[in-house]
From Swiss-Prot:
Gene name in the database record: rpsG
Family in the record: Belongs to the universal ribosomal protein uS7 family.
Subunit: Part of the 30S ribosomal subunit. Contacts proteins S9 and S11.
Protein name: Small ribosomal subunit protein uS7
Keyword entries, A-Z: Ribonucleoprotein, Ribosomal protein, RNA-binding, rRNA-binding, tRNA-binding
NCBIfam families: rpsG_bact
GO BP terms in the entry: translation
Keyword Transmembrane helix: no
CDD domains the UniProt entry points to: uS7_Bacteria
Pfam family, one: Ribosomal_S7
A GO CC term assigned to this protein in UniProt: small ribosomal subunit
């Protein structure tokens, strides 16, 4: 690793419509090949569809869905002696958010349907209701951590 100074993280500008930094980060993660305007349109269209389907504030549904999918613990491989153990570890807030976003976007892309905005809206509504593929992924990660609780003392 270099010995240069550590650069400060660039601040993320909030999005224009909802004035939310989290929405901007989500758009950035969802973007393919630098097509930000297309991704932003998909995001806002899916928010309109959420408002239409649930009748609730889309930003509130989005943030609750994100909170429902955020994992608290995950397993990491640790080599001790000749054996490799899956050790449960707490996750820092930034990684929790990143994983939740990644899982929601991945689940929306795998869904069957025509428009990405429709698939994303459906996945966000499912995550809001504690169902759906992204929520199942979180449950699976938590189950793995619970199953390997015996190795928690290898944490360092």
């Amino acid at each position: 690793m270099g010995r240069g100074k550590i650069t400060a993280r660039r601040p993320v500008a909030p999005d224009s419509k909802y004035n939310s930094v989290v929405v901007t980060r989500f758009i950035g993660r969802m973007m393919l090949s630098g097509k930000k305007s297309i991704t932003t349109k998909i995001m806002y269209d899916s928010f309109d569809k959420i408002k239409e389907k649930t009748g609730e504030e889309p930003l509130a549904v989005f943030s609750k869905a994100l909170d429902n999918v955020k994992p608290v613990v995950e397993v990491k491989s640790r080599r001790v002696g000749g054996a490799t153990y899956q050790v449960p570890m707490d996750i820092p807030e930034g990684r929790r958010e990143a994983l939740a976003m990644r899982w929601i976007i991945g689940a929306a892309r795998k869904r069957s349907g025509h428009e990405m905005s429709e698939r994303l809206a459906s996945e966000l509504i499912d995550a809001y209701n504690n169902t759906g593929t992204a929520f199942k992924k979180k449950e699976e990660v938590h189950r793995m951590a619970e199953a390997n609780k015996a190795f928690a003392h290898f944490r360092w």
